[in-house]
């Protein structure tokens, strides 16, 4: 919800899992948020930009977080397909 000035005034904004599109509840203490940095292809240095991914506890408990993160990085062009 926004006020008259256009600022977001909600107390809690739920996140969605980047891999499954499930809502991450406030009580999902196994969920993680990972920032993947962008690297310049020529110099190999960090550019200061990053992409944020959120993984829910369900994905982590199934042991699929590594595969999900790899798939998301390939989809967003942050890594090469293996």
Curated annotation (Swiss-Prot):
Which one GO biological process term can you cite for this protein?
Answer: translation
Ranges in coiled-coil conformation: none
Q: Which GO terms describe its molecular function?
A: structural constituent of ribosome
The Gene Ontology CC terms held by the record are:
ribonucleoprotein complex; ribosome
Q: Which UniProt keywords apply?
A: Ribonucleoprotein, Ribosomal protein
Please verify whether the record's keywords include Metal-binding: no
Q: Which PANTHER family match?
A: 40S RIBOSOMAL PROTEIN S21 (PTHR10442)
Q: Which family does it belong to?
A: Belongs to the eukaryotic ribosomal protein eS21 family.
Protein name stated in the entry: Small ribosomal subunit protein eS21
Q: What is the lineage of its organism?
A: Eukaryota, Glaucocystophyceae, Cyanophoraceae, Cyanophora
